[in-house]
Amino acid sequence: MDDIVKQAMAKWPNVPHCYSWLGLDTRGNWYMRDDRTQAIGSFASGMPGAKGSMLKHEKLIDFIERNYGVDAQGCWYFQNGPQRVYVELEATPFVWRVDAQGAISSSTKQTASLVQVYMDERGWPYLHTSLGFGLVHTQDVASLAEALELWHWPIQEVRAAELPQRFGYQKSPALMEKNK
């Protein structure tokens, strides 16, 4: 976490949290969601326009990724100065990039080591790593296949609906907050 963010948190400790304004899709892209977008539907609803506007400003994306974390309830957030902005996840908290030699990095540009490979009933591959759990980027499925063969990584089957509970993350912190 950036020092300037830590300083802002200390200076203004009671800023309310923000929900539904930021989303992470299955390809590791960040989306900003205004009130109008949120009214269309949830981030993962599949409704046209519900994701919002994809962020393209590299420095903003880097700032989000440096200050991306998780709370005790498994809700992922971006610490924006003193305000915690909870992230709506289309699938998982991380999107993994994999090369043919088995090197793993997150969409947040952190390297990780493999714990286990999973595949759901749709054929979607996931990795449990030293950093956490996530979906493999669609562009890296072929590289994952090469790494599986090279390193003899075993694949464990899993049901997609069981992933959040099994790996301790919330896809929609806003929904969790609403149901309190």
Q: Where are each of the predicted segments found?
A:
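A short, sequence-level motif marking secondary-structure junctions
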Residues: 37-38, 90-95, 140-143
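Gly/Ser-rich, low-complexity
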Residues: 89-91, 98-100, 106-108
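Short, well-structured hydrophobic secondary-structure segments
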Residues: 29-33, 40-92
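Glycine-rich, aromatic-bearing surface loops/beta-hairpins
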Residues: 105-180
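Long alpha-helical, hydrophobic tracts
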Residues: 1-55
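Acidic surface patches and DE-rich sequence motifs
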Residues: 14, 25, 34, 71, ...
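Residue-level detector of beta-strand structural context in well-folded domains
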Residues: 20, 74-76, 115, 125
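Short, exposed beta-strand/loop patches in secreted or surface proteins that constitute
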Residues: 23-24, 67-69, 94-96, 114-119
